[in-house]
C-alpha cells in the first residue's frame, strides 16, 4: 500500500515537537507502517526528521518565520491560523506535489484533520482516511479512525443509541508509541509529576491541590498558559524535550492526569505506563479504557479520591511491571496490526468484495490485548 502523509503546517515533523500530539502521531505512523513494507510519502517542513520513502518539502523555515515571527512555542501554546502564510504555502505546495506522485488506490492521510482538508478536497480520487481522530468537530472523510471509544461514542451521539445506523468503517484504533523512547524504571524518586499543557482544562490545579493535601512533592512540566501562576511549593520545569520527559516519567512515583474534559486519548498516560509509572486520572474519557483502576493507577471523582490514590501509591499497591505490561498494548508493533487490518478492509472496498471479503487470519486477532 502507498500512503501520502500530510504534515502539520505550523510544526516540523520531528521528535523535537514532542508537545504536539498530531505531529507525534504522524512521525510514529510513518515509522510504524514503513516497517511493514508500505510506501510512505511525507509532505511537510524542510527540516522534518521522519522515516519514509520520500520526504517532500512543502514549507520552509522562512514560511514559519513569515507566519509566526520569533514566537517561541516552547513557552506558550502553539500559535497558528489556517489563513496564515505557513498554511497557505503548505496548501499550495502540497496540492501540486501530490499531483505529481499519486497513483490509483493510494491513501491520503490528513493527520491534522480539517486543518489540511483543502489539500484533500483537490485529490478526491485518492482514498482519504482521517487517522487518529481526537478532535471534537469538523470530521468529514468517508473513512475515519478514532483514537478511543470515548471520542467515537461522543461523535456518534445519543441519537445512535436508538437508531441502527452505525457505519462499519468508522473504527477505533488507539494511539501508538515507540517503546524505545521511554526508560522503564522500578526504583522511583521521591516526587510526583504533572506533564502537559499547564492550564485549568487539563486539571493542573487539581494536581497541585492533591499533592499539597497528600504532603508529596510535585514537579510540573509543559507549555504554560499566559498569566498562569505556578505556586512556590511546585517545581516548574517548563517545556520538557524528549530526553527530559523520559527522565521525569521514569523517576516519578506516579503522574497526575486530572483532565476536566472528555479526554480523547491522553498519550502522556500511556507514556507513563511504558516508564513503569502509575497514573492518577479523572474517571472519564479514554482514561476509563486505558487506566485500569487498582492495576495501572487510579481513576478519581473527588479530591478525596485523588488524595487516597496518592496514599495507595505510597503504600506500593501499584506494580511497575503491571504498568509496563498493559502499556505495551500501545506499542508500534501491536498497533500496526490494527492499522494493517483497517487499511486492508478499506482497500477491499475498492479492489475486492468489500464487506464480504475474507478476513486475513494473521490480522484477525489485532484487537486482542494483554492484561497484567
What name fits each language-model region?
Residues 1-372:
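Catalytic cores of nucleotide-sugar-dependent glycosyltransferases that transfer UDP/GDP/TDP-activated
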Amino acid at each position: 500500500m502507498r500512503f501520502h502523509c500530510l504534515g502539520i503546517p505550523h510544526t516540523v515533523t520531528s521528535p523535537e515537537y514532542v508537545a504536539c500530539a498530531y505531529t507525534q502521531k504522524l512521525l510514529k505512523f510513518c515509522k510504524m507502517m514503513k516497517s511493514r513494507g508500505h510506501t510512505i510519502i511525507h509532505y511537510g517542513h524542510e527540516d522534518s526528521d521522519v522515516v519514509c520513502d520520500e520526504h517532500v518539502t512543502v514549507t520552509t523555515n522562512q514560511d514559519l518565520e513569515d507566519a509566526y515571527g520569533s514566537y517561541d512555542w516552547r513557552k506558550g501554546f502553539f500559535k497558528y491560523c489556517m489563513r496564515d502564510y505557513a498554511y497557505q504555502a503548505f496548501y499550495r505546495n502540497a496540492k501540486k506535489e501530490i499531483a505529481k506522485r499519486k497513483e490509483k488506490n493510494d491513501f491520503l492521510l490528513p493527520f491534522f484533520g480539517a486543518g489540511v482538508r483543502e489539500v484533500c478536497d483537490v485529490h478526491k480520487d485518492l482514498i482519504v482516511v482521517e487517522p487518529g481522530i481526537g478532535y471534537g468537530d469538523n470530521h468529514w472523510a468517508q473513512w475515519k479512525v478514532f483514537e478511543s471509544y470515548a471520542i467515537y461514542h461522543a461523535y456518534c451521539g445519543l441519537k445512535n443509541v436508538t437508531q441502527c445506523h452505525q457505519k462499519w468503517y468508522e473504527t477505533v484504533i488507539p494511539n501508538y508509541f515507540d517503546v524505545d523512547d521511554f526508560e522503564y524504571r522500578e526504583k522511583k524518586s521521591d516526587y510526583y509529576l504533572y506533564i502537559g499543557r499547564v492550564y485549568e482544562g487539563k486539571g493542573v490545579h487539581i494536581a497541585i491541590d492533591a499533592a499539597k493535601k497528600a504532603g508529596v512533592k510535585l514537579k510540573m512540566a509543559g507549555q504554560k498558559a499566559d498569566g498562569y501562576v505556578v505556586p512556590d511549593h511546585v517545581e516548574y520545569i517548563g517545556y520538557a524535550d524528549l530526553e527530559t520527559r523520559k527522565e521525569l516519567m521514569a523517576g516519578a512515583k506516579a503522574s497526575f492526569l486530572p483532565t476536566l474534559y472528555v479526554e480523547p486519548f491522553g498519550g502522556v498516560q500511556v507514556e507513563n505506563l511504558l516508564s513503569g509509572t502509575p497514573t492518577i486520572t479523572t474517571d472519564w474519557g479514554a482514561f476509563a479504557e486505558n487506566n485500569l483502576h487498582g492495576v495501572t493507577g487510579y481513576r478519581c471523582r473527588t479530591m478525596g479520591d485523588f488524595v487516597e490514590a496518592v496514599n495507595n501509591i505510597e503504600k506500593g499497591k501499584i506494580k511497575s511491571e503491571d504498568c509496563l505490561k498493559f502499556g505495551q498494548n500501545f506499542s508500534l508493533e501491536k498497533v500496526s496490526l490494527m492499522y494493517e487490518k483497517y487499511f486492508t478492509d478499506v482497500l477491499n472496498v475498492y479492489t475486492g468484495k468489500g464487506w464480504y471479503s475474507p478476513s486475513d487470519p494473521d490480522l484477525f486477532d489485532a484487537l486482542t490485548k494483554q492484561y497484567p
